Design a protein with these regions (language model features):
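Juxtamembrane boundary at the C-terminal end of a transmembrane helix
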Residues: 291-299
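Transmembrane alpha-helix interface/packing and boundary motifs in multi-pass membrane proteins
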Residues: 241-246, 267
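Membrane-embedded alpha-helical bundles of polytopic integral membrane proteins
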Residues: 2-8, 12-240
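C-terminal-most transmembrane helix of multi-pass membrane proteins
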Residues: 285-286
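Interfacial loop-to-transmembrane junctions
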Residues: 259-282
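Acidic, glycine-rich loop-and-beta core segments that form the ion-binding/anion-interacting portion
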Residues: 253
Length: 299
């Protein structure tokens, strides 16, 4: 998500001459629509590939999430590098890539990998005198924040066999994507009251409510299929809570970007920024959905 507006250069004579013959770009509905179309097209391509992997099965899902986690972790380390943090990037990215693959097996593998990561980083710290504790913290946070958290998508896909498992995992991810889209549309058109202007100036309470409604809509569809032991009240609760945690994930990434002084985590996806920008709500939203479905006896 983009948070920091670009500062405009002063109108020097040379700049005035260079821009004198350039027609002004119309603002308002036209520019909003163009931006929305670009954002939507890129988002649709990303979503189609993602959904295809979820439908094809657990192995394609794990591979896709593994690649996604590696890219997210790389972008995270690139941002923290701007803040002077010198993480062990190879170790961190490797761990981020392996976490979703570990989720293919027993959950004990995830615990074992988490232990191995802590041990490896600890040994690196002991034998690298110039390494600071802040470097260690960032090295640990990168793969846990990305790969470990996103592994919930793989666990969701594997929790229910067959078509129902694909439907559930697609539904959970779709609830966060639709929440993001509804929040963007509502906030762009009628958003007046800012949520956290110092962290994410574009987010509004109106968009926040719109996002919740979008998420609830998808969870109602999941309930209506009757594929799962999901009651109507619990489906509504899941829709609200998952959307809220998705927003919190978005704000956490916005705080990281604001702290290091960047607008986007990368430029991989037009209209969205980097892979981390596109996945920030999934990081906290999917694991929240998994926990709620387990607590509610759905999984």
């Amino acid at each position: 998500m983009s948070d920091r507006p670009k500062a405009s250069a002063p109108k020097t004579p040379a700049r005035k001459a260079a821009t004198a013959g350039t027609p002004a770009v119309k603002s308002g509905t036209g520019s909003w629509l163009a931006g929305f179309i670009t954002r939507a097209a890129a988002g649709i391509v990303y979503a189609v590939v993602f959904i295809l992997c979820l439908v094809l099965g657990i192995v394609p899902t794990a591979i896709f999430v593994s690649v996604m986690s590696g890219l997210c972790c790389y972008e995270f380390f690139r941002m923290t590098r701007l803040d002077g943090k010198m993480a062990n990037e190879r170790m961190g990215i490797a761990a981020a890539v392996l976490f979703p693959l570990s989720a293919l097996g027993d959950s004990m593998l995830l615990n074992a990998q988490l232990f191995a990561l802590m041990l490896a980083v600890g040994i690196w710290y002991v034998w690298s005198p110039r390494t600071r504790i802040s470097d260690v913290a960032v090295t640990l946070m990168g793969p846990i924040y990305t790969g470990f958290m996103l592994s919930a998508i793989v666990l969701l896909r594997d929790a229910v066999p067959g078509f129902a498992g694909a439907l559930l995992s697609v539904g959970v991810c779709a609830s966060l994507w639709v929440s993001d889209s509804f929040a963007y549309i509502v906030g762009s058109r009628i958003g007046k009251h800012k949520m956290v202007p110092k962290i994410s100036p574009k987010k509004s309470w109106e968009g926040f409510v719109g996002g919740i409604l979008g998420s609830v809509l998808i969870w109602l569809i999941l309930w209506a299929t009757h594929f799962f032991k999901l009651s109507l009240p619990y489906a509504l609760l899941c829709g609200v809570v998952v959307s809220i945690l998705g927003v919190i994930g978005d704000l956490i990434e916005s705080r990281i970007k604001r702290g290091v002084g960047v607008k986007d985590s990368g430029n991989l996806i037009p209209g969205h920024g980097g892979m981390l920008d596109r996945s920030d709500s999934l990081i906290f939203g999917c694991i929240t959905a998994q926990l709620m479905l387990m607590i509610g006896g759905v999984l």
